[in-house]
């Protein structure tokens, strides 16, 4: 038995060392989670306006179009649980913060990194949970899988490692103010039919199922919005709940009931808190095809600039 265990250990040790080395090398690769943390911790003294939310904000609102000292801290796939946690952690380290622009996607009120079975073919976002734990020191559990990028993301990690170390391509496309340029117009699908044909599937993936879990998450996320509103209210910070624009084919085919419930939740928060305002651009017809990367994301170098200028006029016109 001892000989067997010794043999197992002998063969396992190289694999363990290889895994540790691979994990270490993964953590040296630039990523938006680490960079957004850098902005919060190293530029916190300067931040007057911050943009939060998921990819619709991270790719779609250009902070350079807004007043001085605006930073885009939104991250793709960041839902309300982490929006709230990020603010709770950092808001008292941002002494000059006056405004928060919160970009809210069509599916956001029903989304949670820890949940599955709410959308068509969705799953628990273990990789994002791990990224928050490792790179932003924000965690809601003590699971080992969420302490390792390799264990949580698997194939995605191998692809990222290959992209950085073998192909020498960018793995992080944020500019100095935090805008993520992954969705620049030059990166968009050139065949118009292909990106238009992808919109119906996107809508299907973004439409919540009619079940008890979806309703529970919806109610939880409303409470998270109220918690963020209170956090801002107690510190004299204005909160702007912004619904970004979507392409015509997208907004004409979404579930009207879900859309109205999204509006209802946002209005509820805006009506309760005197520091909160809501802005709806969901069906804004000022945006054309080149402004969009896909059905519900603006191009980072074209649409995000236009949207940033519109927000400057609407929010900061005084």
Residue ranges and their predicted role:
Residues 31, 257, 261-318:
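C-terminal regions of proteins
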Residues 56-145:
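Membrane-embedded segments
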Residues 48-50, 99, 238:
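Structural motif
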């Amino acid at each position: 038995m001892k000989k067997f265990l010794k043999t197992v250990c002998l063969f396992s040790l190289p694999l363990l060392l290889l895994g540790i080395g691979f994990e270490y090398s993964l953590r040296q690769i630039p990523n938006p989670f680490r960079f957004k943390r850098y902005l919060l911790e190293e530029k916190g003294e300067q931040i007057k306006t911050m943009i939060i939310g998921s990819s619709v904000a991270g790719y779609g609102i250009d902070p350079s179009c807004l007043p001085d000292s605006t930073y885009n801290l939104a991250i793709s796939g960041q839902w309300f649980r982490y929006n709230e946690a990020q603010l709770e952690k950092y808001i008292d380290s941002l002494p000059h913060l006056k405004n928060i622009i919160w970009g809210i996607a069509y599916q956001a009120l029903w989304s949670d990194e820890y949940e599955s079975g709410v959308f068509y073919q969705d799953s628990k976002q273990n990789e994002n949970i791990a990224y928050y734990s490792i790179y932003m020191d924000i965690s809601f559990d003590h699971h080992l899988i969420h302490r390792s990028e390799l264990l949580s993301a698997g194939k995605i990690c191998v692809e990222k490692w290959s992209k950085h170390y073998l192909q020498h391509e960018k793995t992080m496309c944020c500019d100095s103010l935090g805008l993520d340029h992954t969705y620049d117009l030059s990166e968009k699908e050139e065949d118009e039919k292909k990106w238009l044909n992808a919109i119906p599937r996107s809508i299907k993936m973004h439409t919540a199922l009619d079940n008890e879990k979806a309703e529970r998450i919806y109610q939880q996320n409303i409470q998270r919005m109220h918690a963020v509103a209170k956090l801002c209210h107690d510190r004299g910070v204005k909160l702007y709940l912004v619904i970004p624009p979507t392409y015509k084919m997208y907004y004409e085919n979404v579930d009207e009931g879900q859309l109205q419930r999204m509006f209802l939740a946002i209005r509820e928060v805006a009506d309760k808190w005197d520091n909160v305002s809501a802005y709806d651009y969901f069906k804004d017809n000022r945006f054309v095809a080149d402004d969009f990367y896909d059905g519900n994301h603006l191009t980072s170098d074209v649409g995000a600039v236009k949207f940033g200028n519109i927000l400057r006029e609407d929010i900061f016109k005084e």
